């Protein structure tokens, strides 16, 4: 029995030694290994969380910038359409002005041509009147062999011209 008791004591002593060794080892591991590992893991978790937050912020900023760019693009398209419309309106206005000016110039030319034609007609009539008067006087002088006085000559001319105007 004594051997068994010694064996139990040895077994109990070894167990106690192992337990104390384990506790010391656990304390050393806790102090030198577990804390730095958990701190490193916490830092890593914090960094990952920050990276995720940063990525989310970057994505939101990118979406905001994309929306702003789309809005600016829409605004620039509207501005371009407005500029084109203004240019079209200015072109139409200028075209209408040019047409009105051309029509006025054409009417002025037509009126001037009519005046010139009437003046030429009047000049031709006066010239013809003088020529006819001179020819009539010559013919009458030769036929009558006498000179007509101015009043007779004027009456003869007026009668002849009235006859010409009626035939026109």
Swiss-Prot record:
Residues 61-80 are annotated as: Disordered. One of its GO terms (molecular function) is proton-transporting ATPase activity, rotational mechanism. One of its GO terms (cellular component) is plasma membrane. It is a single-pass membrane protein. The chain crosses the membrane at residues 10-30. Pfam families: ATP-synt_B. Its main location: membrane. CDD domains: ATP-synt_Fo_b (cd06503). The keyword Ion transport applies. NCBIfam families: ATP_synt_b (TIGR01144). F(1)F(0) ATP synthase produces ATP from ADP in the presence of a proton or sodium gradient. F-type ATPases consist of two structural domains, F(1) containing the extramembraneous catalytic core and F(0) containing the membrane proton channel, linked together by a central stalk and a peripheral stalk. During catalysis, ATP synthesis in the catalytic domain of F(1) is coupled via a rotary mechanism of the central stalk subunits to proton translocation. Component of the F(0) channel, it forms part of the peripheral stalk, linking F(1) to F(0). F-type ATPases have 2 components, F(1) - the catalytic core - and F(0) - the membrane proton channel. F(1) has five subunits: alpha(3), beta(3), gamma(1), delta(1), epsilon(1). F(0) has three main subunits: a(1), b(2) and c(10-14). The alpha and beta chains form an alternating ring which encloses part of the gamma chain. F(1) is attached to F(0) by a central stalk formed by the gamma and epsilon chains, while a peripheral stalk is formed by the delta and b chains. Belongs to the ATPase B chain family. This is ATP synthase subunit b. It comes from Limosilactobacillus fermentum (strain NBRC 3956 / LMG 18251).
């Amino acid at each position: 029995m004594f051997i068994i008791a010694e064996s139990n004591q040895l077994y109990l002593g070894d167990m106690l030694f192992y337990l104390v060794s384990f506790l010391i080892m656990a304390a050393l591991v806790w102090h030198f290994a577990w804390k730095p590992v958990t701190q490193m893991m916490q830092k890593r978790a914090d960094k990952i969380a920050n990276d995720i937050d940063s990525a989310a912020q970057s994505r939101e900023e990118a979406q905001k910038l994309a929306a702003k760019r789309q809005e600016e693009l829409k605004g620039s398209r509207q501005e371009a359409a407005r500029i084109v419309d203004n240019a079209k309106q200015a072109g139409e206005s200028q075209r209408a002005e040019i047409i009105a000016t051309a029509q006025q110039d054409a009417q002025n030319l037509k009126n001037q041509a009519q005046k010139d034609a009437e003046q030429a007609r009047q000049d031709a009539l006066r010239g013809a009147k003088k020529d006819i008067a001179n020819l009539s006087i010559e013919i009458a002088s030769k036929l009558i062999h006498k000179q007509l006085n101015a009043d007779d000559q004027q009456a003869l001319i007026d009668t002849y011209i009235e006859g010409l105007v009626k035939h026109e």
